[in-house]
Amino acid sequence: MTTKPQKLELTWIGKDNQPKLEPRILIEDPERSYGHTLNPLSRGEYKSPLAGGKHKSPLLGGDSGVGNMLIHGDNLLALKALEQDFAGEIKCACIDPPYNTGNAFEHYDDGLEHSIWLSLMKPRIEIIHKLLRDDGTLWITIDDTEAHYLKILCDEIFGRSNFFGAITWQHSVQGKNDAKTLSLHHNYIIV
């Protein structure tokens, strides 16, 4: 009798009910540009210097020294739009997802049920995984509310052996050595 090896994974309600995303395109808004313009007519012929400069650069003036992009819009749709041209070519991605603290902000609800939050994060991290080079890294800022669930989700997508570390950073100096309670003034960067 042969058994299929099992792997450790995080499960939650709705995990496998992910919407199918169709390919997207990015459209530049000159009002929001920072001086370098992508030529919309050369779609598919560009490659960011982040990815090694393999394709022709459509940056006006031939400046290929710009290695970053700022994309305004829904992050899942933006990631999907990048997937076609940049799969396997991004060296470093940094995301700052909602911490799921229970607060309401102008642009998003930060008090989601854990399963809903994980269902929102999973497709984003899966696309980022496809975008990263073999030696690429993903840096995620997060707090205690979801950090440990997020770490396990990343282990599932990237493989546990690809976890580099968790950086703890203190965002407030209110804690003291003689405090009678635990300090809650820190966040994490999961790499």
Predicted regions and their residues:
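Short secondary-structure boundary/capping segments
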Residues: 87, 107-112, 152-158, 181-185
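Polar, glycine-rich mid-to-C-terminal structural blocks
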Residues: 172, 179-191
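A general structural signal for short secondary-structure junctions and capping/turn motifs
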Residues: 2-4, 130, 180-183
